[in-house]
């Protein structure tokens, strides 16, 4: 299977159901998970879940270094608007992966390989359009796709500089 890393930022206390999420990650050993969180409690992380403890302010500052304009990222929920840019924003962590994606921590996964097949991974650059589970091919072109104009000049700039979601 192609190498996949799911990016999961979560700031605040992780929900009580998080252990179930971790169990479902463990049942998918071919997928890695990158958890960015300020919750430093010792939890039963499987080998394929890589927890990076950091503050929301530190993540915001890191994202800001990638742009020449000031970002509006005042609360963690706004990170949802940045999801299509994770390939660009976290390129060091995602180096070596064929695909990266994002998902919600309230998801319980079955065998992802049954649904996301090698054939799909070889044919598509993006799988899933909803925030609860999306995959993107890890290439420079796809990782910068969020900057492509869609009827207005630099729509990402408007989204990244307003507090609205």
Place the predicted regions along the sequence by residue.
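A structural signal for isolated positions on well-ordered beta-strands in alpha/beta enzyme cores
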Residues: 5-7, 32-34, 50
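Short beta-strand/turn micro-motifs composed of small residues
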Residues: 8-10, 35-37, 103
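N-proximal low-complexity "stem/linker" segments adjacent to membrane-targeting elements
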Residues: 1-20
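GT-A fold catalytic core of metal-dependent nucleotide-sugar glycosyltransferases
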Residues: 83-128
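A short acidic (Asp/Glu
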Residues: 18-19, 44-46, 111-116
